[in-house]
From Swiss-Prot:
GO terms for cellular component: cytosol. (6S)-5,6,7,8-tetrahydrofolate binds at L121, G125, H126, L127, S355, P356, F357. The keyword DNA-binding does not apply. The gene is glyA. Coiled coil: none annotated. This is Serine hydroxymethyltransferase. GO terms for biological process: glycine biosynthetic process from serine; tetrahydrofolate interconversion. Pathway: One-carbon metabolism; tetrahydrofolate interconversion; Amino-acid biosynthesis; glycine biosynthesis; glycine from L-serine: step 1/1. Catalyzes the reversible interconversion of serine and glycine with tetrahydrofolate (THF) serving as the one-carbon carrier. This reaction serves as the major source of one-carbon groups required for the biosynthesis of purines, thymidylate, methionine, and other important biomolecules. Also exhibits THF-independent aldolase activity toward beta-hydroxyamino acids, producing glycine and aldehydes, via a retro-aldol mechanism. Disulfide bonds: none annotated. InterPro entries: PyrdxlP-dep_Trfase (IPR015424), PyrdxlP-dep_Trfase_major (IPR015421), PyrdxlP-dep_Trfase_small (IPR015422), Ser_HO-MeTrfase (IPR001085), Ser_HO-MeTrfase-like (IPR049943), Ser_HO-MeTrfase_PLP_BS (IPR019798), SHMT-like_dom (IPR039429).
Length: 417
């Protein structure tokens, strides 16, 4: 018999302790992984609701199970809010992740073996944009494009490659690029060769929703995103379009269900609905602008301290610190900073001589620290501490000093105040 007072602490202390330790880690560590963020208690409330019990294969009004009248309301709210947020005429909120959303786009628009133009992973792309170890690289003929010597996307080279190889689909979007992407230019190139333009905006969706980064939805045939990262919602995916093409919309829906998934996660879709509503609030725009301001402030200090930033700066939420030429790998930098309670991730940089498991760079992002309330002053102070460690990564005294400073700063800015 189920009772409301059942809890994990009494029943499964081993698991409970792991959860508590992770909660403490989040409170006592500064999170700088560009793809991570803190979601709101409202989103977590939705995800912990009894919606988790309901199977709802199909779409609102067209379910394969009974008892879906209320989950239909939930999913419709999420769909309509997503459309409003990004100026779309179509939204599918069922993908369990960004990668699931991306695989649905491939399935809807392509056949195995078709040619696809995607950003080189080593230049800032994503696994699902054609990496040989991913389904995208295994099933499709991937032609990569990259960045030029200045660290910016080379659109002339992109056009040359597109005309030469005539891909059926071009992919815009990134996981480690700090510039502004010219979506209109990419659509112009796609139209020249009769290709689909597919944009994966996962990293910058929150910035786009707030109007502080260009919106790809008016330019692309189809756009995908995660619902966490800068959007600060639950872990999941979404597919959007403003193509006014009902045939395309049907293909996308079929590629999600039954093509790639069965029952949707209704508790997560409820979390998405809450997050989209939060993103429509005026304070969300203030938050996203601060995300960019904090990233620019961090870049300023890195450059002052003599560190190279790929592309020389940032126009979004992230930066890539290039350690080529220094006696320090990305893996070592990641570990040293982690010892001081600063969480980053090692990341390959353009022309990286080291393997992806070692790398010559670290990727840093500001969504999570901004969510805690950091402004430019705290971001600059933090960057100074990071540089202190990178300057002397094998010095335990430096690491201990910075760790103490980090703990004090975290206490001033709790994740959930």
């Amino acid at each position: 018999m189920l009772k409301k007072d059942m809890n994990i602490a009494d029943y499964d202390p081993e698991l409970f302790n792991a959860i508590q330790n992770e909660t403490l880690r989040q409170e006592e560590h500064i999170e700088l992984i560009a793809s991570e963020n803190y979601t709101s208690p409202r989103v977590m409330e939705a995800q912990g609701s009894q919606l988790t019990n309901k199977y709802a294969e199909g779409y609102p009004g067209k379910r394969y199970y009974g008892g879906c009248e209320y989950v239909d309301v939930v999913e419709t709210l999420a769909i309509e809010r997503a459309k409003q947020l990004f100026g779309a005429t179509y939204a599918n909120v069922q993908p369990h992740s960004g990668s699931q959303a991306n695989s649905a786009v491939y399935m809807a628009l392509l056949k195995p073996g078709d040619t696809v133009l995607g950003m080189n992973l080593a230049h800032g792309g994503h696994l699902t944009h054609g990496s040989p170890v991913n389904f995208s690289g295994k099933l499709y003929n991937i032609i990569p494009y990259g960045i030029d010597e200045s660290g910016k996307i080379d659109y002339e080279e992109m056009e040359r490659i597109a005309i030469e190889h005539k891909p059926k689909m071009m992919i815009g979007g990134f996981s480690a690029y700090s510039g502004i992407v010219d979506w209109a230019k990419m659509r112009e190139i796609a139209d020249k060769i009769g290709a689909y333009l597919f944009v994966d905006m996962a990293h910058v969706a929150g910035l786009i929703a707030a109007g502080v980064y260009p919106n790809p939805v008016p330019h692309a045939h189809v756009v995908t995103s995660t619902t966490h990262k800068t959007l600060a919602g639950p872990r999941g995916g979404v597919i959007l379009s403003a193509a006014d093409d009902e045939d395309l919309y049907k293909k996308l829906n079929s590629a999600v269900f039954p093509g790639g998934q069965g029952g949707p996660l209704m508790h997560v879709i409820a979390g998405k609905a809450v997050a989209f509503k939060e993103a429509l609030e005026p304070e969300f725009k203030v938050y996203q602008q601060q995300v960019v301001n904090n990233a620019k402030a961090m870049v300023e200090v890195f450059l002052e301290r003599g560190y190279k930033i790929v592309s020389g700066g940032t126009s979004n939420h992230l930066m890539l610190v290039d350690l080529i030429g220094r006696d320090l790998t990305g893996k070592e930098a990641d570990a040293a900073l982690g010892s001081a309670n600063i969480t980053v991730n090692k990341n390959s940089v353009p022309n990286d001589p080291r393997s992806p498991f070692v790398t010559s760079g670290v990727r840093i992002g500001t969504p999570a620290i901004t969510r805690r309330g950091f402004k430019e002053a705290e971001s600059k102070e933090l960057t100074g501490w990071i540089c202190d460690i990178l300057d002397d990564a094998n010095n335990p005294a430096v690491i201990e000093r910075v760790k103490g400073q980090v703990l004090a700063l975290c206490a001033r800015f709790p994740v959930y105040g």
